[in-house]
Amino acid sequence: MAKKVKKTDDISKKFGEDRRKALDDALKNIEKDFGKGAVMRLGERAEQKVQVMSSGSLALDIALGAGGYPKGRIIEIYGPESSGKTTVALHAVAQAQKEGGIAAFIDAEHALDPAYAAALGVNIDELLLSQPDSGEQGLEIAGKLIDSGAVDLVVIDSVAALVPRAEIDGDIGDSHVGLQARMMSQAMRKLSASINKTKTIAIFINQLREKVGVMFGNPETTPGGRALKFYASVRLDVRGNTQIKGTGDQKDSSIGKETKIKVVKNKVAPPFKVAEVEIMYGEGISRTGELIKIASDLDVIQKAGAWFSYNGEKIGQGSENAKKFLADHPEIFDEIDHKVRVKVGLLEDEVLDNNQETVELPETDEFILDLDDAIEIED
């Protein structure tokens, strides 16, 4: 019986060696025909962790799970009109430029406001802009920019405005059933591999439509067919919520709106998380506002009554004064932002340690003590 087992083991070993040799020969032939790296073992990849670029919003980075938009992937941002879709995309453009990258904006809607983009931090002198005449032209331009490997971010605004050439050349009222969906399906097939290879982030902004005759379930859908839904690694649903009223002379005016960004699809982290941000008119997402809220929830910033404190020092009475303080002191903003990202697991605590001194809060006249602790000043 022992001899039979040994013989069987020898046969299995020889069979395994033959399979290994056949696999090695196949890999050599594939490499010869299609180039090095056409097939590789997953553990041999230099970068196994998904690389990300910050969205430009701390709350959205946390909701995305990975700390930002994954590089080499397709992102879809959709929502109702005036919900803040383009604002979210422009913050990504500003962040890409801040990190030294090159961004392109395909303005199919022909509605980009350069002044507003600049207010959000976009360097409009360096931003590549295209306003195509047709959907095919816009997608071809995006494809050539991606294929170059020199562009870090491409934004297409919007899918609904990518009108096929046949529809433009035809008459109003002509039927073009499924034409845009076929165009988008072909574009996704062509662009997806190039996007992944060049590590370009492609953001598609989309609008909402309603299905006719839907009695049960959600009647909302996005134009352009289903291809974009399948190819997108991340899908964001942007919805404007309540209006933000001003203070003082602007107490009766709306100065912004609270916005919820829901991650409805996420291939790199758990989905269905929600980021709540304040979009201020003319300014974009209030980065100081979201930082104060999140840092207070994590006890990085302490709140007692109306006062906000950091490192034992008061930084402002009321959220507006605290926002102003952080806006005036970017080094303290960056320090708090880093601590928050470490606490939520987006960063490792490799910058701030026991041997490194934290930023000292400046002494200014605007930060006074409570009335009980007030100091009487003699004449």
UniProtKB/Swiss-Prot annotation:
Binding-site list for ATP: G79, P80, E81, S82, S83, G84, K85, T86
InterPro entries for the chain: AAA+_ATPase, DNA_recomb/repair_RecA, DNA_recomb/repair_RecA_CS, P-loop_NTPase, RecA-like_C, RecA-like_N, RecA_ATP-bd, RecA_C_sf
Primary location class: cytoplasm
GO biological process assignments: DNA recombination; DNA repair; SOS response
DNA damage recorded as keyword: yes
SUPFAM superfamilies in the record: P-loop containing nucleoside triphosphate hydrolases, RecA protein, C-terminal domain
One GO CC term, this protein: cytosol
Keywords from the UniProt entry: ATP-binding, Cytoplasm, DNA damage, DNA recombination, DNA repair, DNA-binding, Nucleotide-binding, SOS response
Bilayer-spanning residue ranges: none
Superkingdom, taxonomy of origin: Bacteria
UniProt-listed PROSITE patterns: RECA_1, RECA_2, RECA_3
GO molecular function, one term: ATP binding
Subcellular location(s) per record: Cytoplasm
Family matches, as CDD domains: RecA
Entry-linked NCBIfam families: tigrfam_recA
Cited function: Can catalyze the hydrolysis of ATP in the presence of single-stranded DNA, the ATP-dependent uptake of single-stranded DNA by duplex DNA, and the ATP-dependent hybridization of homologous single-stranded DNAs. It interacts with LexA causing its activation and leading to its autocatalytic cleavage.
Family the entry assigns: Belongs to the RecA family.
Protein name per Swiss-Prot or TrEMBL: Protein RecA
Organism: Streptococcus uberis (strain ATCC BAA-854 / 0140J)
Gene: recA
